[in-house]
């Protein structure tokens, strides 16, 4: 995705409308902000923004109103979109392109989508829309057909763990490799969730290893989850209920325990069907 967008910016062939789709925390909004800086950068480098010119700095700190981020979840009415449309016809004051980043665009009402469609059909040369959504099926086909679509996939646990270790080093957080590995699995492909979990664990203080993560987040851990799975597989209802009660009495998050159980089942199935592959 980034290579394609870089090439478009470098060659001056950007679209007037983009649609970024994918699960939460995969970088859609972050990428949209970088793209907004790149198309307005005064000294771009192979499609990347320099992040030092007045345009890049102004967009980053939010002082340039020509680049606006709108949360459709709280601004989903037709009046807000019409106001945006009326403003969009004017040339930008400080940058080359006026960019509107509309997050959670699927939350717009039907009249709001219709109002948005009108400007997507005949956009001014100076205008760019970047729409982001976690629920693509809720976006009307008329909107989809007028956007370049990019699908953001879940980030691999290895990449999340590497990023968490980097951030921990920058923030002087004592994060161990096993702690980063566990956090990366709990993040479920969303780097933002991984960073939030790291902050939560670091707030407790001390070394953030796998044991500290389990304690801070109220998780059962591999051993207790495996024991629960053994009771289930052996059809020992009493043992399973006693194990669950023990976890509950130990202030473990039952919902999280069920999530761990689901992950364990997935890993077991993967090992059974593809023993040479990785889970």
Question: Locations of the language-model features?
Answer:
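P-loop/Walker A NTP-binding region and its immediately flanking N-terminal helices
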Residues: 1-149
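Extended, largely alpha-helical regulatory/partner-binding modules appended to the mid-to-C-terminal parts
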Residues: 54, 58-65, 80-83, 96, ...
């Amino acid at each position: 995705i980034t290579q394609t967008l870089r090439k478009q910016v470098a060659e001056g062939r950007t679209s007037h409308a983009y649609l970024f789709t994918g699960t939460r925390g995969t970088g859609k909004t972050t990428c949209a902000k970088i793209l907004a800086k790149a198309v307005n950068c005064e000294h771009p480098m192979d499609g990347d923004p320099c992040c030092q010119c007045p345009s890049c700095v102004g967009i980053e700190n939010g002082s340039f109103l020509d680049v606006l981020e709108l949360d459709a979840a709280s601004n989903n009415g037709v009046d807000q979109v019409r106001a945006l449309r009326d403003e969009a016809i004017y040339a930008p004051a400080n940058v080359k392109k006026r960019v509107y980043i509309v997050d959670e665009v699927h939350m717009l009402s039907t009249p709001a989508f219709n109002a948005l469609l009108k400007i997507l059909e005949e956009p001014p040369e100076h205008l760019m829309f970047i729409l982001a959504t976690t629920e693509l099926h809720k976006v009307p086909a008329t909107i989809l057909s007028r956007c370049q679509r990019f699908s953001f996939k879940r980030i691999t646990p290895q990449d999340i763990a590497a990023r968490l270790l980097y951030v921990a080093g920058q923030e002087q957080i004592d994060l161990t490799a096993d702690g980063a590995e566990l956090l990366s699995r709990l993040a479920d492909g969303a780097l933002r969730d991984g960073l939030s979990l790291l902050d939560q664990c670091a707030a407790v203080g001390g070394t953030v290893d796998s044991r500290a993560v389990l304690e801070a987040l109220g998780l059962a851990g591999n051993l207790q989850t495996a024991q629960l799975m053994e009771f289930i597989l052996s059809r020992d209802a009493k043992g399973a209920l006693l194990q669950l009660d023990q976890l509950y009495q130990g202030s473990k998050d039952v919902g999280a325990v069920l999530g761990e159980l689901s992950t364990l089942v997935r890993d077991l199935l993967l090992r059974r069907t593809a023993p040479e592959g990785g889970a």
